[in-house]
């Protein structure tokens, strides 16, 4: 079990280090095969915070604080409304809807179609709102931000820095909430220590590839991960 989990964390950390997203996308369903989700989810939150802290420090010169704050503030404001959506609408319907949009967008991007938004700072408001709605309803805060940055053909380091900053702040909030509710316990911390070397191995190799990979290859990898994310969301709705 530990060997399998070790390999999963290496792979997931590698993906995260390269693209700045996709860690939970890979790790959650695979680790869920051999471990309880009560262990897996807090573990992934802790590891995500650690990874994003390291990546963010390395990419700090590419962070646009004003844009990030707009994105975060809009997301926080909309999260309670997302929770209301979860109460009002079936969760599976929301997952299906999000999955279809993400898959369709990935296909469109792959075909080379995009609509460039000139005022990006202003556009971060609706993007943040959509992210907050999805975060509060189905815990999928990433797709709106990833889709927007992909549409804008953001330079890979700007893409990674923006996404990492956004997730880093969400990670901090989530760790506090999980700790308060007793979800981060001795068992979770013990498993975190055992798997920590795997995280570092995967992350370091991923970050090296992320620095060397060509912009076009980076965009293609992002689109593939988006397609996988959307597909898993659709499958998870049934």
Per-region residue spans from a language model:
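Glycine/small-residue-rich loop that forms an oxyanion/phosphate-binding "nest" at active or ligand-binding sites
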Residues: 63-110
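Membrane-interface helix termini and inter-helical loops of multi-pass transporters
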Residues: 83-93, 178-191, 235-238
């Amino acid at each position: 079990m530990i060997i399998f989990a070790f390999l999963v964390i290496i792979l997931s950390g590698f993906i995260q280090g390269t693209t700045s997203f996709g860690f939970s996308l890979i790790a959650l369903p695979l680790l869920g095969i051999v471990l309880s989700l009560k262990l897996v989810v807090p573990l992934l939150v802790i590891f995500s915070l650690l990874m994003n802290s390291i990546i963010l420090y390395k990419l700090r010169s590419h962070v646009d604080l004003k844009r990030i704050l707009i994105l975060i503030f809009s997301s926080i404001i909309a999260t309670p409304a997302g929770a209301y959506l979860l109460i009002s609408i079936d969760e599976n319907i929301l997952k299906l809807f999000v999955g279809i949009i993400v898959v369709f967008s990935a296909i469109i991007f792959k075909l080379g179609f995009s609509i460039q938004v000139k005022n990006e700072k202003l556009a971060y408001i609706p993007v943040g709102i959509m992210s907050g709605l999805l975060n509060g309803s189905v815990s999928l805060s990433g797709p709106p931000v990833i889709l927007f940055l992909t549409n804008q053909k953001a330079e890979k380091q700007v893409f990674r820095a923006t996404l990492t900053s956004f997730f880093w702040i969400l990670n901090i909030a989530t760790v506090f909430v999980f700790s308060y509710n007793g979800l981060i316990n001795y068992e979770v911390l013990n498993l975190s220590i055992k798997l920590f070397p795997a995280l570092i191995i995967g992350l370091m190799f991923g970050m090296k590839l992320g620095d060397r990979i060509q912009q076009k290859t980076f965009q293609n990898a992002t689109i593939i991960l988006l397609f996988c994310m959307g597909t898993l969301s659709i499958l998870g709705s049934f």
